[in-house]
């Protein structure tokens, strides 16, 4: 019965130009244009998912569907790709808005700072200013979420969930010690290798490889993320990853303190990107905060097998807030 309900949940795919970059947005629910919807039935709140790196929004569809269902299908759940991590298929129209057409191009939009500005640009041009927001950041998406709150404190955010948050000491983490030399010093070798191996590869073979991989990982392929094997997208993910290792160093305690009442941190016990000691440190510094340690051994990449569990946790935490909407 539960699987049947999930199949009925509408998910609308759009490719838009945001800050000058092609961007995939997956919209869960019947609402596709909140900005121009003036009807009385327009929802008062948007749940907005910001992915980790690579920022393939298609990976988050099962999670978005589960969350949409658990919130009684009353609120849209949207997931945005990172700039440069998704390219529209040749037969897909790229939508633009007059605001985005006139907007200043974001400097280094594929880098750490550019990705933050990219998300803010999307909210400015596609979400009404008076619409309440629930932000869900996963991995480096948690860092983006904190930075968005810091840069635009007037955003009408009622809650922000930081899942397996890579918000500090990334290069010192177990995975960071491996990734740093690869992403910061050897990435040009990776770029060249990727282009030589993947660029000549026919689309049919890429599609077959991706679909097989998704089956192994038990991920839905409703929106097949061909960009996984697109050299341009992989290069942008590596570029972002290199900046993460170098720049995500010190935890932004000032921003955390300012917005603590609306923040929920969710750390893993087996997370090589943000080990348990990071949880212990932030818990000690902010004992009054909603800072949780996973008790279910859910891995950093929860979207592979644990979408329902994470959606359950968030929906349960939101009950009181959503009842007031």
Swiss-Prot record:
<feature type="active site" description="Charge relay system">
    <location>
        <position position="271"/>
    </location>
</feature>
<dbReference type="Pfam" id="PF10230">
    <property type="entry name" value="LIDHydrolase"/>
</dbReference>
<dbReference type="GO" id="GO:0035356">
    <property type="term" value="P:intracellular triglyceride homeostasis"/>
</dbReference>
<keyword id="KW-0378">Hydrolase</keyword>
<keyword id="KW-0256">Endoplasmic reticulum</keyword>
<dbReference type="GO" id="GO:0004771">
    <property type="term" value="F:sterol ester esterase activity"/>
</dbReference>
<protein>
    <recommendedName>
        <fullName>Lipid droplet-associated hydrolase</fullName>
        <ecNumber>3.1.1.13</ecNumber>
    </recommendedName>
</protein>
<keyword id="KW-0551">Lipid droplet</keyword>
<feature type="active site" description="Charge relay system">
    <location>
        <position position="300"/>
    </location>
</feature>
<feature type="active site" description="Nucleophile">
    <location>
        <position position="139"/>
    </location>
</feature>
<dbReference type="GO" id="GO:0005783">
    <property type="term" value="C:endoplasmic reticulum"/>
</dbReference>
<dbReference type="GO" id="GO:0042632">
    <property type="term" value="P:cholesterol homeostasis"/>
</dbReference>
<comment type="similarity">
    <text>Belongs to the AB hydrolase superfamily. LDAH family.</text>
</comment>
<dbReference type="InterPro" id="IPR019363">
    <property type="entry name" value="LDAH"/>
</dbReference>
<dbReference type="GO" id="GO:0005811">
    <property type="term" value="C:lipid droplet"/>
</dbReference>
<dbReference type="InterPro" id="IPR029058">
    <property type="entry name" value="AB_hydrolase_fold"/>
</dbReference>
<dbReference type="GO" id="GO:0160077">
    <property type="term" value="P:lipid droplet fusion"/>
</dbReference>
<dbReference type="GO" id="GO:0019915">
    <property type="term" value="P:lipid storage"/>
</dbReference>
<comment type="function">
    <text>Probable serine lipid hydrolase associated with lipid droplets. Has low cholesterol esterase activity. Appears to lack triglyceride lipase activity. Involved in cholesterol and triglyceride homeostasis; stimulates cellular triglyceride accumulation and cellular cholesterol release. Acts antagonistically with PNPLA2/ATGL in regulation of cellular lipid stores. May regulate triglyceride accumulation indirectly through stimulation of PNPLA2/ATGL ubiquitination and proteasomal degradation. Promotes microtubule-dependent lipid droplet fusion.</text>
</comment>
């Amino acid at each position: 019965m539960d699987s049947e309900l999930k199949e009925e949940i509408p998910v609308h795919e759009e490719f838009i130009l945001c800050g000058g970059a092609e961007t995939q947005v997956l919209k869960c629910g019947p609402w596709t244009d909140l900005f121009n919807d003036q009807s009385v039935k327009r929802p008062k709140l948007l749940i907005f998912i910001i992915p980790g790196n690579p920022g393939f929004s298609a990976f988050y569809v099962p999670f978005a569907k589960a969350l949409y269902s658990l919130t009684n299908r009353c609120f849209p759940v949207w997931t945005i790709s990172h700039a440069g991590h998704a390219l529209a298929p040749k037969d897909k129209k790229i939508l633009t808005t007059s605001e985005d057409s006139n907007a200043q191009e974001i400097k280094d939009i594929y880098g750490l700072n550019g990705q933050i500005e990219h998300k803010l640009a999307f909210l400015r041009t596609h979400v009404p200013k008076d619409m309440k927001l629930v932000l869900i950041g996963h991995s480096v998406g948690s860092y983006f979420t904190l930075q968005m709150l810091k840069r635009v404190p007037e955003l009408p955010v009622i809650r922000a969930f930081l899942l397996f948050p890579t918000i500090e000491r990334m290069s010192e983490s177990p995975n960071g010690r491996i990734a740093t030399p690869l992403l910061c010093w050897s990435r040009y070798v990776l770029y060249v290798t990727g282009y030589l191996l993947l660029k000549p590869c026919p689309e049919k073979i890429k599609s077959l490889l991706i679909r097989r991989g998704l089956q192994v990982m038990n991920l839905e392929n409703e929106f097949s993320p061909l960009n996984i094997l697109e050299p341009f997208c992989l290069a942008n993910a590596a570029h972002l990853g290199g900046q993460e290792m170098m720049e995500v160093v010190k935890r932004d305690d000032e921003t955390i303190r300012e917005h603590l009442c609306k923040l929920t941190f969710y750390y893993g016990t087996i997370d090589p990107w943000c080990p348990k000691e990071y949880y212990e440190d932030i818990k000690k510094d902010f004992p009054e905060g909603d800072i949780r340690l996973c008790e279910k051994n859910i891995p950093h990449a929860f979207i592979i097998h644990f979408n329902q569990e994470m959606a359950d946790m968030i929906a349960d935490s939101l009950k009181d807030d959503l009842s007031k909407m």
